[in-house]
């Protein structure tokens, strides 16, 4: 006694110290209050079962039994329940993680995480069920239990009872909805062992129902076999009868096929009705196979009931969906080839399962086998498909942590793996926080640029255009585009080049590349392309046209349109492609032309200075503008001659001959007045005059009026830095008089 007392005291706070208990959320499982919890350090998800002894006096009502006896009786039932669960280990039984800890005020133990009792599960689904599988989006409609869920759960209870009756030699004696819990994976687990007994027990005593004790602490007559209640004869067949009552209650809002309200006389009447051959046939049940199953379990005569082994093979439990779930439960034991074949079939038929089955049963099993690299290509599609319906928080914590190592090393897997990840990129984008997506998924995309598979390369590039809603402009310009420029320059795969060009076009149209980035980075890359394959050429044409709407007009004139003409005459283009190029070029040219004309029209008009140009090869003087020149001819002549002040004496001597000739020419002039047609007539000089400085018109002289000799003007000294040549006259009409120094110019004075 002292040792037990010390043990209880020393362990009474272990659960409290080792687990974080969420007191705000709780469910009832029989007499136990159950809290969700997690183990400190490992974050293992568990449930903590607690019974508060302080409330026992409130629960126990006055009855025929002494209050202290009732209290001890109830506490012994609770201890037996936990000790039986701790001793019995089977996948279909509730698994105890921490044994019972008892103090003066409470009793507690820890199990694997559960959701609720089956009784509450049925109640929350309003007693509804569906035998039509999942809805169009793969999810169960409402809270109704799908029939395949029921089939799976019942098979799990059968497995547990087979273990109890066969290996453990134990009879449960308390099978009902409150003795079955649903765990976090949706599996049904058997509990409530307070009234269990050994098969070899000498006596099976049924205690009369005590209305002074809560019903959760007593057996329910509505779920007990008639031989046990009336004759105190029991065996495994008694559990079969209780199992039949459980099946019926699932389809009848937790109500057993017997409705005795724990009164013996009422019970006997109900059993008499049950013995009728048409009793079960009259019930509203979903299938004939289910009715046959109930007949095999609810026979009044124990000898006519089927064994648990026989129930397991009932036609009600046949079908592809339930067979797949049973295969999944034994998945670790299957051969690799069987696993691959099963997964291929499952991916095609996944939507036939209720979403609760997908998320709670199938998904955890698939995640547990991701360490098998041969199975990864078959597992990922199902994992992603199920993940579409998960909350973002659950996806991040449960699914993404399991698949991220595969995503990081995707290039080491067959191409099916990265292609599958790309296929479900929208799922990743919607479920992950944007920061986590950018830091973990975008690098995976970059890595696929260098993948050995052409499909993976092109898909990784094409996928970038779908991510612009979460990728900013800076990331595109500073991180993505440099990698695309490099890949575009080094790859010899035409499909990759076309994919990159398409991505550039998306970036431009979505305003992720500005004028500077296009002109400074993109156009030089495109200019180096030498291939003239039609797909590449047309891709480049599309990019150039899109860029032409953004970059300056001067760049369009200088770099884009010439390049488009070069590409358009590629001999590899078809007529249709060529015509398309021409349409695009004309469209761009027209747009630029209209834009430029509009700019010119918007400029303020300016006054153009009047000037007269002289054509040295024509006898006509042309006016540059419609207005007369503001410079008089005489003044213009004076300006020209004034520029000769720096002539050397030798130069002046040479020009005397030309001046004499010019005098002869001027004497023949009909009038000194300036007319619109006045001009000089120049002759070809003789060889003797070839070294003279002749006054010949130059292009710069066109800024001034024509030189008209005038006797009223005298030549003035010209600046040294300006040289004026004398006109060359015809030898046949003008002779040089070199002996007279300035005689030829005197006529001008």
From Swiss-Prot:
Name under which the protein is recorded: Protein kinase domain-containing protein ppk32
Cellular component per GO, a single term: cytoplasm
Chain intervals with Low complexity compositional bias: 657-670, 721-735
Record GO terms (molecular function): ATP binding; protein serine/threonine kinase activity
Region Disordered, annotated ranges: 598-677, 706-749
Location(s) in or outside the cell: Cytoplasm
Domain remark from Swiss-Prot or TrEMBL: The protein kinase domain is predicted to be catalytically inactive.
A single BP term in Gene Ontology: negative regulation of TORC1 signaling
Annotated ranges, domain Protein kinase: 21-317
Bias (Polar residues): 602-651
Superkingdom assignment: Eukaryota
Gene: ppk32
Xref: Pfam families: Pkinase
Disulfide bond annotation, renumbered to this chain: none
Modified-residue entries (Phosphoserine), positions: 632
PROSITE patterns xref list: PROTEIN_KINASE_DOM
